[in-house]
């Protein structure tokens, strides 16, 4: 299999996946929405801004400026933008995509204005295009450095999921498939909010007991919301939910966890965002999850508490006190 792939989004994650595709021998072009960033990648053959550990791109990976002008060249489009830019990117693709082209998304989150799943946004805007989601426990730097990684490809079309699986998989990068695109998206989005909570707990030196409790009860919250939205129960114990939650809550490669850690250390939201100096998906996703939980009458104490710290100026210490002293209940 030798394909031509366009990658839209040149952050660390988009670049890591572009590298993985190039390692497989595909011909890959990557685009950043910032012209000066594209200029840097074209001139130096790397992504010094977001993935400086990779000194040189393979020959099969190059930056591209005006991707719209050469869209007919590509077999598939990989969207790896922040969730805030996903809808705009899909609208741009609608105007120029050809019938044989399909979309793979590596973006985690919900639509920022409607709180819809990103797959729903893509299906509404470009209804006859196949859509697959690549998600799971995967830090960009480790993928780029060819460390063993396992992820999930979710699509309503199992044949397109299998196609995408083969597109990416090699001895360092293993893809599983699922048709539960709802559960895969809910897990990948909500875990970013919970990672902020885990970071707050770490910043306040709460220890590993609290960390274990947060992950376990956080998984229960993901499951409750996911089932309400139509997910399969088996998905929550897999890579896209439990796996991604464990990774993102437990390691400081996670921007969401680092952001929460700085909050737990007493920094303001503005100071914490500035210190991370990159997109913190969980910060905006917290609004969407909070609104969805209210709409569907799902009780999500950890998510609600994190939302209140982020948007209602609640002190993290008060958040913890409220969580620990609320009404006692059965675990299930």
From Swiss-Prot:
What superkingdom does the record give?
A: Bacteria
Q: Which residues bind sn-glycerol 3-phosphate?
A: 108, 136, 138, 191, 244, 254-256
Residues noted as binding NADPH in the record, renumbered to the chain: 13, 34, 108, 140, 255, 279, 281
What catalytic reaction does the record list?
Answer: sn-glycerol 3-phosphate + NAD(+) = dihydroxyacetone phosphate + NADH + H(+); sn-glycerol 3-phosphate + NADP(+) = dihydroxyacetone phosphate + NADPH + H(+)
Give a Gene Ontology cellular component term annotated to this protein: cytosol
Q: Which InterPro entries does the UniProt entry name for this protein? A: 6-PGluconate_DH-like_C_sf, 6PGD_dom2, G3P_DH_NAD-dep, G3P_DH_NAD-dep_C, G3P_DH_NAD-dep_N, NAD(P)-bd_dom_sf
Which keywords describe this protein according to UniProt? Answer: Cytoplasm, Lipid biosynthesis, Lipid metabolism, NAD, NADP, Nucleotide-binding, Oxidoreductase, Phospholipid biosynthesis, Phospholipid metabolism
Catalytic residues (UniProt)? 191 (proton acceptor)
The EC number(s) given in the record are 1.1.1.94
Chief place of localization: cytoplasm
Q: Where in the cell is it found?
A: Cytoplasm
What's a BP term from Gene Ontology annotated to this protein?
A: glycerol-3-phosphate catabolic process
PROSITE patterns (UniProt xref): NAD_G3PDH
Q: Please state the pathway this protein functions in, per its UniProt record.
A: Membrane lipid metabolism; glycerophospholipid metabolism
Q: Name one GO molecular function term.
A: NAD binding
The protein's matches in HAMAP family, at most eight in alphabetical order, are given as: NAD_Glyc3P_dehydrog
- Family per record: Belongs to the NAD-dependent glycerol-3-phosphate dehydrogenase family.
Role, per record: Catalyzes the reduction of the glycolytic intermediate dihydroxyacetone phosphate (DHAP) to sn-glycerol 3-phosphate (G3P), the key precursor for phospholipid synthesis.
- PANTHER family, per the entry: GLYCEROL-3-PHOSPHATE DEHYDROGENASE, GLYCEROL-3-PHOSPHATE DEHYDROGENASE [NAD(+)] 2, CHLOROPLASTIC
Please report the name of this protein according to its UniProt entry: Glycerol-3-phosphate dehydrogenase [NAD(P)+]
Q: Which species does the entry assign this protein to?
A: Francisella philomiragia subsp. philomiragia (strain ATCC 25017 / CCUG 19701 / FSC 153 / O#319-036)
């Amino acid at each position: 299999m030798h394909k031509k792939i366009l990658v839209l989004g040149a952050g660390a994650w988009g670049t890591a996946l572009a590298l993985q595709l190039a390692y497989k021998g595909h011909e890959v072009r990557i685009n950043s929405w910032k012209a000066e960033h594209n200029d840097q990648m074209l001139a130096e053959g790397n992504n010094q801004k977001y993935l400086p550990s990779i000194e040189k791109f393979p020959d099969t990976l190059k930056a591209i400026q005006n991707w719209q002008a050469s869209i007919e060249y590509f077999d598939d489009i990989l969207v790896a933008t922040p969730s805030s830019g996903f809808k705009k990117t899909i609208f741009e693709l609608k105007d120029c995509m050809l019938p044989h082209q399909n979309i793979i998304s590596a973006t985690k989150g919900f639509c920022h204005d409607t709180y819809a799943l990103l797959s729903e946004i893509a299906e509404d805007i470009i209804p006859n295009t196949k859509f697959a989601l690549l998600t799971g426990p995967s830090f960009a730097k480790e993928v780029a450095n060819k460390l063993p990684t396992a992820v999930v490809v979710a699509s309503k079309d199992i044949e397109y999921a299998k196609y995408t699986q083969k597109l990416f998989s090699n001895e360092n990068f293993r893809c599983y498939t699922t048709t539960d695109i709802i559960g895969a998206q809910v897990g990948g989005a909500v875990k970013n909010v919970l990672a902020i909570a885990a970071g707050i707990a770490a910043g306040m030196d709460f220890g590993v007991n609290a960390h274990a409790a947060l992950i376990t009860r956080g998984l229960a919250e993901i499951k409750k919301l996911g089932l309400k939205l139509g997910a399969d129960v088996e998905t929550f114990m897999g890579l896209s939910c439990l796996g991604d939650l464990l990774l993102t809550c437990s390691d400081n490669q996670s921007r969401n966890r680092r952001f929460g850690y700085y909050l737990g250390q007493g920094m303001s939201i503005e100071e914490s965002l500035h210190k991370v100096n990159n997109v913190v998906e969980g910060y905006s996703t917290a609004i969407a999850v909070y609104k969805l939980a209210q709409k569907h009458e799902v009780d999500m104490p950890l998510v609600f508490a994190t939302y209140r710290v982020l948007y209602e100026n609640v002190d993290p210490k008060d958040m913890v006190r409220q969580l620990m002293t609320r009404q006692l209940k059965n675990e299930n």
